[in-house]
């Protein structure tokens, strides 16, 4: 892909990066490592290894090696997670490690530290309770002070809903304009978006048998996009929601500034 001008981004848990270090260093635009901890103990609790030994230091060492002479950006990802008992009571949370993790990310030379709320299997925000939210809120305030010109702390727009305990995201529009700009290509087929991958009535084609150009201009894709109604089909939190709101305003005539910031990863 890289040799043909296709930009490649990789998300990984980081445990086996050493096997592909040359490719990760030289053929990616970005690598984002899902760590979700800032210490061996918390890592083992939320990302346990079958050996019983925490892989935290192994992952951090491999990230450090990647960063030494990387060509693209390297990010440290932290999803806020909690463990619950059978009645839904919170037993523990990795949110206590947020500040430690951000400091580790900065120390090893990551370009950014990303904090995200957890979602359930249907893409609705996971309700983790007031105590976890308060813990995360405190740490998020602290780690913003770690930012510099070359190290950023980033959060998705959904973090604000997480802070407020809002688990759904109602939509005011009945079409998805973002789906005219992107899709989701997988081994099982090509879908309207990543949220509907695996859903047969949202499958616009199959790149195993047809070119993307043929899929994109097919009657099947046109028919499916006419049926997609975010008010009905997308009550979960969608990362493209703000983009859709802006596109709807642009369709009504709103003018926006054009920036020289072309990026294949829209």
Predicted regions and their residues:
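Radical SAM enzyme [4Fe-4S]-AdoMet core and its adjacent flexible, acidic
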Residues: 4-7, 23-210, 226, 246-266
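Short beta->alpha connector loops
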Residues: 12-17, 80-83
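Immediate flanking context of iron-sulfur cluster ligation sites
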Residues: 169, 216-236
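Local cysteine-cluster metal-coordination motifs and their immediate loop/turn environment
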Residues: 192-195, 230-243
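Conserved ATP/PPi-binding loop(s) of AMP-dependent carboxylate-activating enzymes
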Residues: 212-214
